[in-house]
A protein has these predicted regions:
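PLD/PLD-like phosphodiesterase catalytic module centered on the HKD motif
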Residues: 9-186
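Short, small-residue-biased leader/transition segments that mark boundaries at the very start
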Residues: 1-2
């Protein structure tokens, strides 16, 4: 039953996320984490992501707003890459992926990784099981990670810098809006 699979804060969301990160830590260099959220301020999650990085886990995050983790610091967050996309649209989608292939656990959620969201608000993360939906979410992740127009990379110094512009130019928000319009016309 899908209801039994939901992770809900303040009851189980934070502990589940921490456990999922621990699972990736056990995989070491084969571990993978992708997170798309608006804010990252929860100290326990930040510490656990740093542990994952030190274990060799590759962590890619797209965080639109507040981010209290500095990526790329040797022996601390060297395996973490963080980008931010601020464009025409306010981002509301939140995606968490842990692992790869058949072992990947994917969630869509209402929760940012902020203490107020993980401990004091009612928020939900829903696992994604349907292969077609998973493929669509992976396609969205790929587009967001390839944005070379609006995306900015967070440096170890806490400065956001433009991603190197390559061809073809890709504004992820515009591209995804065009895709949504095409889908609506079908």
């Amino acid at each position: 039953c899908i209801r039994d699979s939901l992770i809900v804060s303040p009851v189980s969301l934070k502990s589940t996320v921490l456990n999922l990160i621990d699972e990736e830590i056990k995989k070491g260099e084969n571990g993978r984490i992708f997170v798309k959220i608006n804010s990252l301020t929860d100290a326990e999650i930040i510490d656990k992501l740093s542990q994952a990085s030190c274990a060799g886990v590759k962590v890619r995050m797209v965080i639109r707003g507040i981010c209290c983790l500095l990526p790329g610091i040797p022996n601390k967050t060297g395996n973490i890459e963080i980008s931010s996309i601020v464009g025409r649209y306010l981002e509301h989608s939140r995606i968490y992926c842990f692992g790869t292939g058949a072992d990947e656990k994917m969630y869509i959620s209402s929760a940012d990784f902020m203490t107020r969201n993980t401990e004091r608000r009612v928020e939900v993360a829903c696992p994604v099981y349907d292969e077609k939906l998973r493929a669509k979410i992976h396609a969205i992740m790929d587009v967001v990670l390839c944005d070379n127009v609006k995306a900015r990379l967070l440096t170890p110094e806490g400065v956001y810098v433009k991603k190197e512009r390559t061809e073809p130019r890709l504004d992820s928000q515009e591209f995804l809006m065009e895709q949504a319009e095409k889908f609506a016309d079908e």
